[in-house]
Amino acid sequence: MTEAFDSGAFLSTVSGRPGVYRMFDSDARLLYVGKAKSLKKRLASYFRKTGLAPKTAALVGRIAQVETTITSNETEALLLEQTLIKEWRPPYNILLRDDKSYPYVFLSDGQFPRLSIHRGAKKAKGKYFGPYPSAGAIRESLSLLQKTFFVRQCEDSYYKNRTRPCLQYQIKRCKAPCVGLVEPEVYAEDVRHSVMFLEGRSHALTNELSTAMEEAAINLEFERAAELRDQIALLRRVQDQQSMEGGTGDIDVIAAFVNPGGACVHLISVRGGRVLGSKNFFPQVGIEEEVAEVMAAFLGQYFISSPERDLPSELIVNVVHEDFPALIEAIQALRGRELSISHRVRGTRARWQQLAVTNAEQALGARLANRQHVAARFEALAEVLNLDEPPQRLECYDISHSSGEATVASCVVFGPEGAIKSDYRRYNIEGVTAGDDYAAMHQALTRRFSKLKEGEGKLPDILLVDGGKGQLSMARDVLNELAVPDLILLGVAKGATRKAGFETLYLNDAANEFTLRGDSPALHLIQQIRDEAHRFAITGHRARRGKTRRTSTLEGVAGVGPTRRRDLLKHFGGLQELSRASIEEIAKAPGISKKLAESIYANLHSE
């Protein structure tokens, strides 16, 4: 906090009413915008002597001036906050990056309408469907419609100047209205069917086509019946892929995931019970941001700062935040529509919620694995460790078990271009006291570096051990026992709060202890490798434990004898694949009823 700013004098003048506050530095640059139910209480929390998060402490240290605006209620404060964030994009706020407007499917007017992707203002005459979360999602729908109903997608200038059918006609993607090869009434029917699909009425459309197919067969119009059959097959395939069981409404499933170095919000858009697609967002965040804070900031900026975006009737999220009631009230006031938000969901909705979480986690992982991103972090690590050049190979080890059961050690390897997965290794630990992580690590390192002494594998530049002084000392003992040439040892211990960003690091021995700033790229690299070793160890442990626990699992299921057991495993390709299948997927196997599928599923997931 700058010397010029007297927080005590300032707080004595602040109102306890709802409002918005703006923090500026000594150069009058806007640092942060926030809203509060009580301005006095919220602003007082910034000037406590202890307990501030690193990012908050850094912000407070730069404050030279604070301005407030009183509002009539919390909803009004939230709306003003989002307006100011959108206009000024302060560096200490969680910021959703600018994005192009969402695309729509556009059906033009005229005797032979055209289907196309549209962004921006809706000036042209015709119908708009969407919005879709991405252009890729639209292309999937347009591709299906082109294969199914043959509505043209060419530019009007191209369409008006044709003298013979183009390639799309030859490959059965268009009926060539440009040269009069289709009657207007027939084309209009194809357009009507396309509209039904785009409006989410694909089940009604399928039923209508099924009736038409039966009539064609009765009238001995076998070619027409075959065409309708193919259309129905395409529609049912996409229904299986896109349908959301038990739902016909408009829903956005949104999951936020935060990891050292970044955050991702994944949005799945469901309209009329049909999945239109999904999209990843990567907000600008500080390292210690909580996932609920990221979610609240995203919802505000996504639905309030961009009112042109489509609003569903329900949001399904993976976290809750105290601001959600005010957020929903503000969105409803702005849009004039009802909106519900759900966190605890069951059944299919819970699976969609988990799918969004998984997608957010994987998308962020892929982003962090970007080669240039990783290379820059390697350079930062070299600077921190005073190395002449960036290391070329880092190995990290971790241990995973369940109360000593099925202990597995992992070794993951990273280079300047990212993870070297071909060099990953797992070690099934045997002959040690259950739960003795030191002995397990000793065995894993001994096996790894004994192979190195025999000429197998490469020597790492840095050996990273997930653990404190004890694990580091044990690793040093192993290297000394095997006379391994000097390499850098780095121990990573969780800090007092056990939160990411507060790790304690040990270089080569327990006496050389240090920490890095939470926003350090070098620390981000260490965290990324440590977390990958943890993930790889856990998956190996679960697989080993599961293999032990599920041996002959199917033998205990009533109604599944040797023949049916063999057929089931053949159908799914093995027990592991069968274990991943849902009840509905198991029931689709030959000779398996829904009730038997439930018994099989329950047996496989009894642990």
UniProtKB/Swiss-Prot annotation:
Main location as per UniProt: cytoplasm
Domain of life: Bacteria
Subcellular location(s) per record: Cytoplasm
One term under GO cellular component: cytoplasm
GO molecular function: DNA binding; excinuclease ABC activity
Keywords: Cytoplasm, DNA damage, DNA excision, DNA repair, Excision nuclease, SOS response
Similarity annotation: Belongs to the UvrC family.
Summary of subunit composition and partner proteins: Interacts with UvrB in an incision complex.
Protein name: UvrABC system protein C
Taxonomic lineage: Bacteria, Pseudomonadati, Pseudomonadota, Gammaproteobacteria, Pseudomonadales
